[in-house]
Amino acid sequence: MLTLYGREVSSRLLLGTARYPSPAVLADAVRASNTDILTISLRREMAGAKKGGQFFELIRELDRHILPNTAGCHTAKEAVLTAKMAREVFRTDWIKLEVIGHHDTLQPDVFALVEAAKILCDEGFEVFPYTTDDLVVAEKLLEAGCRVLMPWCAPIGSAMGPLNLTALKSMRARFPEVPLIVDAGIGRPSHAVTVMELGYDAVLLNTAVAGAGDPVGMAEAFARAIEAGHQAYLSGPLEPRDMAVPSTPVIGTAVFS
């Protein structure tokens, strides 16, 4: 079980709800993934007006924990306002905090992120901050009151997979007791296995599933991959060696002269 802000969930896969071919495909992908947590962009869905209402009804029928996000916000003020609106709509203190600083890379504005995190934590929100793999920023977010960190492994939607394993390893080692969820950049189930083998607690996916040729099949593949990576981490995988090591014991081997 994974505990996030005192709430236990059985799945280590968090799933985004945007860009699926149809509501039916989204619903089937959610079920195939076995996820307990769905992320939702309040701004995007409210912009759809009538369709947004139909979407929210579908989400309610799926009966998962809702993690609203502040996608599309570029300032701390925008993010805080969106978070407050999401709290009213979804009746939850959970918020996935995104403050985007660059239009091309969608890299977080870490200065505004920390500012918004401090405000929201002080107002009783349970903040899931989308951040970089920078350890100093991570420290500042924890000092602001965050009890979960969500570092990227590559730019949002890039599907490149983990670009800086050293940084991800360092973050895991530096914060052994903090739930760490890789958010952004995952493209394949093998990428998810890689980060889970490092000891990360969960993976958040959206584009990798929604944009796949078969989103439902991909959701199931990721669910299996994340579980496999977590089990591998718990089982203690071998560390790489510079030299060959025989797998067959030498003792008892016949010697011919």
Swiss-Prot record:
Its main location: cytoplasm. Pfam families: ThiG. Keywords: Cytoplasm, Schiff base, Thiamine biosynthesis, Transferase. One of its GO terms (molecular function) is thiazole synthase activity. It catalyses: [ThiS sulfur-carrier protein]-C-terminal-Gly-aminoethanethioate + 2-iminoacetate + 1-deoxy-D-xylulose 5-phosphate = [ThiS sulfur-carrier protein]-C-terminal Gly-Gly + 2-[(2R,5Z)-2-carboxy-4-methylthiazol-5(2H)-ylidene]ethyl phosphate + 2 H2O + H(+). Homotetramer. Forms heterodimers with either ThiH or ThiS. This is Thiazole synthase.
